[in-house]
Amino acid sequence: VRDGYIRRKDEFKFKCYVDGKDCDDVCKSEGGSAGYCTALGFLCYCAGLPDDKAWKPTSS
């Protein structure tokens, strides 16, 4: 379990909207405890994400 950017099948990082609701829902549906949308880059950042769902620098 880790905190980090969520990795999705169709994108290597999940883009989100400023309010973060979509990000929180996606993180929880993928096993995370919470999620928010970063202001820089509008990318979804998750807390408590399973290792296989988290983006790693070697992921694409």
Swiss-Prot record:
- TM region(s), chain numbering: none
Q: Does the keyword Secreted apply?
A: yes
Query: GO cellular component terms?
Result: extracellular region
What subcellular compartments does it reside in? Secreted
Mention one GO molecular function.
sodium channel inhibitor activity
User: Keywords, A to Z?
Assistant: Disulfide bond, Ion channel impairing toxin, Neurotoxin, Secreted, Toxin, Voltage-gated sodium channel impairing toxin
Q: Where is the LCN-type CS-alpha/beta domain?
A: 2-60
Comment text on domains: Has the structural arrangement of an alpha-helix connected to antiparallel beta-sheets by disulfide bonds (CS-alpha/beta).
Instruction: Spell out the family assignment given in the record's similarity comment.
Output: Belongs to the long (4 C-C) scorpion toxin superfamily. Sodium channel inhibitor family. Beta subfamily.
Q: What is the protein name for this chain?
A: Putative insect toxin Acra6
Q: What organism is listed for this UniProt entry?
A: Androctonus crassicauda
Print the organism lineage: Eukaryota, Metazoa, Ecdysozoa, Arthropoda, Chelicerata
